[in-house]
């Protein structure tokens, strides 16, 4: 049976400032930690990325032409405050006013994120969100943006608090490149959630007309053997690290006893302690019912088995299938069942995980209000022929995920939109330019855009709401 989506459903495309804009030092923009980190550690940089800084009118015209009625955009904090606070960069402010005006002109609703992996270097080198001073700087930055950009109707505080902590302090593929420090992972998550809560409360107290929420990456975790209590425990602990800790902070305003038992076990095995203060929980409690929406970024699920050896994580950055490894002492090891397909980057394709995660939020956090799927898509080594890409694999991937959204809505979940990652091809943090996700192919040499087969398919779905 052909499935459908609601008439008012948003069919969006997602971008991020650092991955799309280029112009990393243009018009007064301050440095971010990624600038030097990429130069020192990788074979690529974020120059010029997709040159969105100059070519956004082209991308928004394409969005309008192809039925994309929402766009995720992030503001580069260091374009507004080059050092993270203090002096405002007028040219950066002007750029975003112009960008948002173009969105509205093209009838593409901007969903605007304040922080998408790109803390200004001056604050990042001072501890990033492990340093509580930077909570204050973030709230001040948020307050400035809320007041300066009344044309924005949908705000997101952070994109993927979980992967920021993981990338910086667990996997070590984000600056500062620290590995296996789980105390820092949890502390980063916590301090960013406090920052989120304070920004949300401020937004509501000021009476702004728009909506505000947060975007969490929520990869669903399953036990490899559901009959084996040790595998079940491994999946629960892995879920606490990546999902439950931040969801509790968002919607409970505290960490449940079950969550803290898991956190304490992980820290007992791996070392470290947390600084959780009374005023933090006052802030979390005050904001728990103020979130207008939850953004869920979903790409994959993981299966866990019990594991007691030493921690080792190997990141597959070049698309060499089977080269990744993930095992955490006292938590578990990721082992995918044979029956689930995976991408060249070892990302497991499992749409059921998106359905299960949505229904989990609905059940465990009934104060969630509504959900947008703020990122979902397939990273591919696209083959450019005949001025297009015949990306049937991407179409199939998105179709399967839209179908489970239709199921979730039918089963009572309030899901209001879907943003494909990504609108056009962009630069990928730890994979460079080989891994493409866009509806529109970008020739990074010429910066020309070409609609892929998926763009034509997505347009039809957006126009008819029929998933075919």
Swiss-Prot record:
NCBIfam families: lacG (TIGR01233), PRK13511.1 (NF010036)
GO MF annotation terms: 6-phospho-beta-galactosidase activity; beta-glucosidase activity
Catalytic site: 160 (proton donor), 375 (nucleophile)
PROSITE patterns to which the protein is assigned, alphabetical: GLYCOSYL_HYDROL_F1_1, GLYCOSYL_HYDROL_F1_2
Signal peptide (UniProt feature, chain positions): none
Domain of life of the organism encoding this protein: Bacteria
UniProtKB keywords: Glycosidase, Hydrolase
EC numbers for this chain: 3.2.1.85
Protein name: 6-phospho-beta-galactosidase 2
Gene Ontology CC: cytosol
Pathway: Carbohydrate metabolism; lactose degradation; D-galactose 6-phosphate and beta-D-glucose from lactose 6-phosphate: step 1/1
Similarity comment: family membership: Belongs to the glycosyl hydrolase 1 family.
Transmembrane segments annotated in the record for this chain: none
A Pfam family that the UniProt record links to this protein: Glyco_hydro_1
Organism, as annotated: Streptococcus pneumoniae serotype 4 (strain ATCC BAA-334 / TIGR4)
GN (gene name): lacG2
A Gene Ontology BP annotation from the UniProt entry: lactose catabolic process via tagatose-6-phosphate
Binding positions for D-galactose 6-phosphate per the UniProt entry: 19, 116, 159-160, 297, 428-429, 435, 437
Enzyme class name: hydrolase
């Amino acid at each position: 049976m052909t499935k459908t989506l609601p008439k008012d459903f948003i069919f969006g495309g997602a971008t991020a400032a650092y991955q799309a804009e280029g112009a990393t030092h243009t018009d007064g923009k301050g440095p971010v930690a990624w600038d030097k980190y990429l130069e020192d550690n990788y074979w690529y940089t974020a120059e010029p990325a997709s040159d969105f800084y100059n070519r956004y009118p082209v991308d928004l015209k394409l969005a309008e032409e192809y039925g994309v009625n929402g766009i995720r955009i992030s503001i580069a904090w260091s374009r507004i405050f080059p050092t993270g606070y203090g002096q405002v960069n007028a040219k950066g402010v002007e750029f975003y006013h112009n960008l948002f005006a173009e969105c509205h002109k093209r009838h593409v609703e901007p969903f605007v994120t304040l922080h998408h992996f790109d803390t200004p270097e001056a604050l990042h080198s001072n501890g990033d969100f492990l340093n509580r001073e930077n909570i204050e700087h973030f709230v001040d930055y948020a307050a400035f943006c809320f007041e300066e950009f009344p044309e924005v109707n949908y705000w997101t505080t952070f994109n993927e608090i979980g992967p920021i902590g993981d990338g910086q302090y667990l996997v070590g593929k984000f600056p500062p490149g620290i590995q296996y420090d789980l105390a820092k992972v949890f502390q980063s998550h916590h301090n960013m959630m406090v920052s989120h809560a304070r920004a949300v409360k401020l937004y509501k107290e000021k009476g702004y007309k728009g909506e505000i929420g947060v975007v969490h990456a929520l990869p669903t975790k399953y036990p490899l053997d559901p009959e084996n209590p040790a595998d079940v425990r491994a999946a629960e602990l892995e879920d606490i690290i990546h999902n439950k800790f931040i969801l509790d902070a968002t919607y409970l305003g505290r960490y449940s006893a079950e969550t803290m038992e898991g956190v304490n076990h992980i820290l007992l095995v791996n070392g470290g302690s947390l600084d959780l203060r009374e005023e933090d929980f006052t802030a979390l409690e005050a904001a728990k019912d103020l979130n207008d929406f939850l953004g869920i970024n979903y790409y994959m699920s993981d299966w866990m088995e019990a594991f007691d050896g030493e921690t080792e994580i190997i990141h597959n950055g070049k698309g060499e299938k089977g080269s990744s490894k993930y095992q955490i002492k006292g938590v578990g090891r990721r082992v995918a069942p044979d029956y689930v397909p995976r991408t060249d980057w070892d990302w497991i394709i499992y749409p059921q995980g998106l359905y299960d995660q949505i229904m989990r939020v609905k059940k465990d956090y009934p104060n969630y209000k509504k959900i947008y799927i703020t990122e979902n898509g397939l990273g591919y080594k696209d083959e450019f022929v005949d001025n297009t890409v015949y990306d049937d694999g991407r179409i199939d991937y998105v179709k399967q995920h839209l179908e489970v959204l239709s199921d979730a809505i039918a089963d009572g979940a309030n899901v209001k939109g879907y943003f494909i990652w990504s609108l056009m091809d962009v630069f990928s943090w730890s994979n460079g330019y080989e891994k493409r996700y866009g509806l529109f192919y970008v020739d990074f040499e010429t910066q020309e855009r070409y609609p892929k087969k998926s763009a034509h398919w997505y347009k039809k779905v957006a126009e008819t709401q029929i998933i075919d």
